[in-house]
Design a protein with these regions (language model features):
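N-terminal secretory signal peptides and thylakoid transit peptides that target proteins
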Residues: 1-14
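Structural micro-motif
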Residues: 115-131
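A short beta-strand-turn-helix
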Residues: 41-58
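Thiol-based oxidoreductase modules, predominantly thioredoxin-like and allied folds used
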Residues: 85-113
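N-proximal helix/coil linker or "cap" segments that precede and/or mark the start of modular domains
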Residues: 24-38
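Non-catalytic, surface beta->alpha helical segment in thiol-disulfide oxidoreductase systems
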Residues: 126, 134-173
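Typically the conserved alpha-helix immediately C-terminal to a functionally engaged Cys/Sec
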Residues: 72-87
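Short active-site neighborhood of thiol/selenol oxidoreductases, capturing the structured segment around
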Residues: 55-69
Length: 186
């Protein structure tokens, strides 16, 4: 029969062998899931773009709303997969915004808007929506939708979700359409 000490040592050994625990999405007081690796932003998009570019990453904005079942799936299914989390963390800075929120965000052109007004400016109507922005310093001079290099609207299964992030990370949008990229991947 194992002593308590032996049992505790064996349990600790199994826990260590399993590897480090993966961070899980946390439900915020506002009713949103949040990943601990999302960017803590002052909500000044031009500055966030500069810092992500300096870190060798691309900028993505995820729009969510309280009670959105597919937003929940993005966090509890897609972001919960270690391969997806690792890929996104290596290649992107991600900012989370509320489709109906009132926090003030400074857009690339210096215009200050509430989250709800910013969403309307970009034509974001549903959640989850993920916008991907080009790492260029002239975005302020472009129309809002022309600033994006890709957009995910709605929930995508993990494989397709990861492929959309790869399309941007690999800058495949500079060489052709998403459709051509996905065809080459199949």
């Amino acid at each position: 029969m194992l002593s308590r000490r032996a049992l505790m040592i064996a349990s600790a050994g199994f826990a260590l062998a399993a590897g480090p625990a993966q961070a899980a999405a946390v439900m915020t007081d506002g009713g949103f899931y949040r990943e601990d690796w999302f960017l803590d932003s002052f909500l000044e998009l031009a500055d966030d773009l500069k810092s992500s570019t300096a870190a060798g990453k691309q900028l993505a904005v995820i729009w969510e709303q309280r009670g959105c079942p597919y937003c929940r799936e993005v966090h509890l299914v897609n972001f919960a997969r270690k391969d997806i989390e690792t890929y996104i963390r290596e290649h992107f800075e991600v900012i989370e915004l509320d489709l109906h929120g009132s926090r003030i965000v400074t857009d690339f052109d210096g215009k200050r808007l509430g989250e709800k007004q910013l969403a309307a400016r970009y034509g974001v109507r549903g959640t989850p929506t993920i916008q991907f922005f080009a790492d260029r310093d002239d975005l302020g001079g472009k129309a809002p939708r022309e600033r994006e290099v890709n957009r995910i609207q709605g929930y995508l299964a993990p494989k397709d979700f990861l492929r959309m992030f790869a399309f941007v990370a690999e800058r495949a949008y500079e060489r052709g359409s998403l459709r051509d990229y996905l065809r080459r991947q199949s």
